[in-house]
């Protein structure tokens, strides 16, 4: 049931973008990473539609400087508990520390683990995986991003 709802969501996303409202880069991003998003949804419960929308937004559809130099698809910063590879990038402030990965798959996996292991996101996992609006607004409420329109951006992308 969830897989069929997910596929419907993906077709809606693809149809929306195929209608010419988004760039070829967005279509390429979805095609390149949809299976990773589905796999992570099945593994952890993070909706594939949310993961793809975040990835599209955070990476400028795979073209941002940060993703090109670090495979960081979700803009996750280092913080004090990160022991992995790091890269420095200008974001809200100059020279901020971001997590760096060996592959997109590692970034997708870490994003899911980051959400699952962080108590401030725990309430999201009580939502139905098809409730992308609840997830989008919940991510903003929990402080995932500083952009005040973050949830609306995700919903619009989906």
Model regions and ranges:
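Catalytic cores of secreted/periplasmic lytic hydrolases that degrade extracellular macromolecules
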Residues: 2, 18-158
């Amino acid at each position: 049931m969830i897989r069929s709802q997910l596929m419907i969501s993906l077709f809606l996303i693809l149809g929306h973008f195929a209608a010419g409202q988004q760039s070829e880069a967005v279509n390429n991003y979805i095609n390149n990473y949809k299976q990773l998003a589905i796999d992570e949804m099945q593994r952890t419960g993070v909706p594939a539609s949310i993961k793809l929308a975040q990835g599209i937004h955070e990476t400028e559809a795979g073209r941002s400087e940060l993703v090109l130099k670090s495979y960081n698809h979700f803009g996750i910063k280092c913080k004090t508990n990160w022991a992995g590879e790091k890269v420095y990038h200008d974001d809200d402030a100059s020279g901020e520390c971001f997590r760096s990965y060996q592959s997109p798959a590692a970034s997708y996996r870490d994003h899911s683990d980051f959400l699952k292991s962080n108590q401030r996101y725990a309430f999201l996992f009580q939502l139905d995986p098809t409730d992308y609006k609840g997830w989008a607004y919940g991510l903003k409420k929990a402080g995932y991003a500083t952009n005040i329109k973050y949830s609306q951006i995700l919903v619009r992308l989906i």
